[in-house]
């Protein structure tokens, strides 16, 4: 390859791929590209000896979480000087913190004559790749050398690499030739890196400056606390805008209207400027104290008040800000999503609905029409520009928090929701990417016995594949501007998604998409004669009283019709679906109405098979049917036959098929950025998931009360894989203290078997018990142990919340959960809680999660 190089030299990045007939058949791992520094000498020739790069086993060390924060080298060395006859030696050594560097030592004077204190430091200009250019004219061949871990300040060797001497025969270089030897790896006897962190939603943060909700300014204060306690990661929930109706139901952080825009409530209004109107400023100061004094977030009051402030500060400062060069850069970089989002938000409020299908105008997205609305001379522009202004400030504030975190060696870990709202900017502007006639959810699990119905549309992966998953690539790349690690919510959705028909409320009537449905002949091959009755709800006199109690007669009269078979009933035509039943009971929230409604949902889902959504005369066994009445109506032979096909269908049939589906998407998506990737792999997990995550070096999630081994009631912390995130509880679960009080018998077993205590378990989780559980988790094998703030505070009787019920963030079985949990103390108080902070520091240090190297 011949290149024209400027006199000052240049840098090139490159990687390798294999092509056949101009078609790429294989690419090497290139998330961290090779970098070559070229001399400005026009006569220069380079001989390059590279090795094909597969994905590194220790991929996490190459992530921006490590290279930009945890093991960052902020003061990079200069590009190594060039020689007329050069030998460039490169090596990867990512597990070296800023106090150390890689050095080279060898069998001659130019390399220190094997004296480690005379080793030659290498350049970290392309960290975590180290390199040095030696003057080959001063070298004697054959050359022998080794790499050394070298302390920069003390200027002495710390340890030699774990390898035999490296050997290089005479390359017979001529003047103006340079040999580049790369893709070497240096390994040292350094303990594996482990860290601890905290998980807390941004809305839950509380400082003395908060406005009734946590904001991006509060993130800096949380970073300060993390640093003071030697925690390395702050994990948050999604922060995208979820504004639909401006009601508390918008508090659900996973139902965003944009995958790019941030929720306006996260703006720190103090950073946006001070109102010149002193009476208005005084009013907001008073409101701030009122809202911040509440034990939980008042979503509606917070957002209403902040929006009043946004309008006033925009009127005062907007014109100047929008004319600034910094805003111009932001706008040009984000125009593609910012304009549709701003217009969508404006029209949502103007037409008083987020359902764009109901808008009298612009219900079908037209880019040219939107462009006209966004022109400064448009009558709509002032309303639209307000959203530009808010998003610009949110961007500045989060970028500042990210920079602050990196400077202090802390990783901000974001959250990528698996779904989007069907009433969102993306559904409006790019409907071809989604299946809007279905609902995404999850099959039954420990979180919800009826499964979960998230209401999101599912993805049209066939369309996404055609453009190389551009939609996802842009999403990940945008996220990498703010985060160095992220959690893939429901990573199973990249293998298959649980799709629920629009007429269903619960998740039980769903089916996996994509999947391989069963024909009637295949069902019968298991010994179960197929009958049409298996497709309709089984409703029999014998169990109606069990379901409805004193309401049985009312249910028969109002919702059921007798069938020809004595004792058997069908649903009336107007109540054949769960949505029809839901509509009938809309607004009726008394105990009896909910009892009857939920009982009818149970009847409607009592089918043995669910028809496939695409292939006629193909079926799926209904998930979890063994607990329901239609299964009990089968004889023993039929039950055994059904269980055989059920086991084959759900646990074996799709393993290779789903693996192929995931490997189409996940490799290029997870490698599109250098963020550290963590997968939420809970629930009904196919066997193929762990192997794919292992192949792609994705961190798993490990929770002791949700073990991956179905034969265990609790997970064994010492068996957790190193490449994992360990936690006690997630936002979808009760906290440690809450769980302790939920099921006394289970708690007793945990107390005796996992904690190894004799006798009767305490009825509440004492600070001492909580500290023991926390310590055990910190001692696990996992690279990261990230605990919720509530679980960290549980170890101290003085600082834990007196009311354990206030600590729960979400109840997945409740589709109308109010996401409003806030810290019961301020971040300023937390910083001053010396005994608690000392205890956390000691726990982290004692368990090896405060590495010095």
Report residues per predicted region:
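Residues at beta-strand starts and edge strands
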Residues: 10-12, 83-87, 100, 128-130, ...
């Amino acid at each position: 390859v011949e290149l024209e190089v400027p006199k000052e030299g240049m840098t090139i990045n490159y990687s390798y791929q294999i092509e056949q007939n101009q078609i790429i058949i294989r690419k090497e791992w290139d998330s961290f590209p090779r970098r070559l520094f070229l001399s400005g000498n026009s006569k220069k020739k380079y001989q390059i000896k590279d090795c094909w790069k597969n994905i590194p086993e220790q991929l996490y060390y190459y992530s921006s979480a490590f290279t930009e924060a945890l093991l960052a080298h902020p003061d990079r060395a200069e590009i190594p000087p060039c020689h007329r006859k050069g030998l460039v030696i490169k090596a990867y050594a990512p597990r070296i913190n800023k106090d150390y560097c890689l050095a080279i030592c060898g069998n001659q004077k130019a390399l220190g004559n094997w004296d480690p204190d005379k080793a030659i430091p290498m350049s970290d200009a392309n960290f975590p790749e180290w390199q040095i250019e030696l003057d080959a004219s001063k070298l004697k061949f054959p050359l022998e050398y080794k790499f050394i871990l070298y302390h920069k300040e003390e200027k002495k060797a710390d340890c030699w690499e774990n390898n035999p001497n490296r050997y290089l025969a005479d390359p017979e270089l001529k003047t103006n030739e340079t040999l580049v030897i790369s893709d070497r790896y240096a390994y040292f006897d350094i303990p594996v890196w482990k860290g601890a962190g905290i998980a807390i939603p941004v809305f839950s943060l509380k400082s003395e400056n908060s406005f009734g909700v946590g904001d991006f300014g509060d993130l800096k204060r949380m970073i300060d606390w993390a640093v003071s306690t030697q925690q390395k990661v702050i994990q948050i929930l999604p922060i995208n805008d979820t504004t639909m109706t401006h009601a508390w139901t918008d508090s659900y952080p996973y139902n965003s209207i944009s995958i790019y825009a941030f929720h306006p409530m996260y703006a720190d209004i103090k950073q946006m400027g001070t109102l010149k109107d002193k009476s208005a400023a005084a009013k907001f100061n008073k409101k701030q104290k009122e809202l911040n004094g509440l034990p939980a977030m008042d979503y509606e009051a917070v957002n209403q008040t902040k929006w009043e402030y946004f309008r006033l500060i925009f009127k005062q400062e907007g014109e100047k800000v929008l004319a600034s060069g910094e805003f111009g850069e932001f706008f040009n970089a984000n125009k593609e999503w910012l304009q549709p989002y701003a217009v969508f938000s404006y029209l949502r409020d103007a037409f008083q609905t987020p359902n764009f299908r109901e808008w009298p105008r612009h219900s079908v997205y037209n880019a040219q029409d939107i462009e006209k609305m966004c022109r400064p001379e448009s009558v709509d522009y002032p309303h639209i520009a307000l959203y530009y202004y808010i998003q610009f400030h949110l961007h500045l504030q989060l970028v500042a928090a990210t920079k602050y975190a990196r400077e202090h060696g802390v990783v901000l870990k974001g959250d990528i929701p698996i779904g989007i709202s069907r009433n969102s900017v993306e559904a409006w502007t790019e409907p071809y990417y989604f299946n809007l006639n279905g609902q995404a959810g999850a099959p039954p699990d420990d979180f919800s016995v009826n499964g979960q119905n998230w209401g999101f549309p599912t993805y049209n992966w066939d369309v996404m594949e055609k453009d190389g998953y551009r939609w996802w690539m842009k999403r990940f790349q945008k996220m990498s501007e703010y985060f160095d690690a992220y959690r893939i919510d429901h990573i199973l959705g990249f293998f298959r998604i649980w799709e629920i028909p629009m007429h269903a409320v619960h998740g039980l009537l769903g089916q996996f998409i994509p999947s391989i449905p069963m024909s009637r002949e295949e069902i019968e091959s298991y010994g179960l004669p197929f009958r049409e009755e298996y497709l309709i709800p089984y409703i029999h006199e014998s169990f109606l009283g069990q379901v409805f109690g004193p309401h049985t007669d009312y249910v028969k009269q109002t919702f059921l019709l007798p069938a020809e078979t004595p004792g058997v009933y069908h649903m009336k035509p107007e109540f054949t679906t769960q949505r029809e039943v839901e509509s009938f009971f809309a607004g009726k929230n008394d105990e009896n109405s909910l009892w009857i409604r939920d009982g009818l949902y149970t009847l409607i889902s009592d089918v043995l098979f669910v028809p496939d959504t695409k292939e006629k005369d193909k079926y799926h066994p209904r998930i979890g049917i063994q607990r329901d009445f239609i299964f009990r109506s089968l004889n023993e032979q039929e039950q055994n036959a059904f269980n055989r096909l059920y086991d084959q269908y759900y646990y074996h049939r799709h393993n290779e098929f789903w693996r192929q589906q995931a490997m189409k998407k996940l490799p290029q998506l997870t490698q599109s950025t250098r963020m550290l990737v963590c997968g939420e792999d809970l629930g009904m997990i196919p066997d193929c998931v762990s192997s794919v995550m292992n192949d792609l070096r994705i961190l798993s999630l490990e929770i002791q009360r949700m073990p991956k081994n179905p034969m265990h009631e609790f997970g064994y912390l010492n068996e957790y894989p190193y490449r994992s995130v360990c936690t006690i509880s997630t936002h979808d679960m009760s906290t440690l203290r809450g769980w302790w009080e939920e099921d006394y018998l289970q708690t007793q077993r945990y107390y005796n078997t996992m904690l190894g205590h004799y006798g009767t378990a305490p009825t509440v989780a004492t600070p001492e018990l909580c500290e023991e559980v926390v310590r055990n988790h910190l001692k696990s094998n996992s690279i990261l142990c990230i605990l919720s703030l509530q679980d960290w505070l549980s170890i101290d009787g003085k600082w834990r919340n007196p009311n354990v019920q206030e600590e729960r963030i979400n109840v997945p079985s409740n589709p109308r959960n109010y996401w409003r949990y806030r810290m019961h103390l301020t971040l300023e108080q937390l910083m001053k809680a010396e005994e608690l902070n000392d205890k956390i520091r000691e726990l982290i240090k004692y368990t090896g999660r405060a590495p010095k190297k």
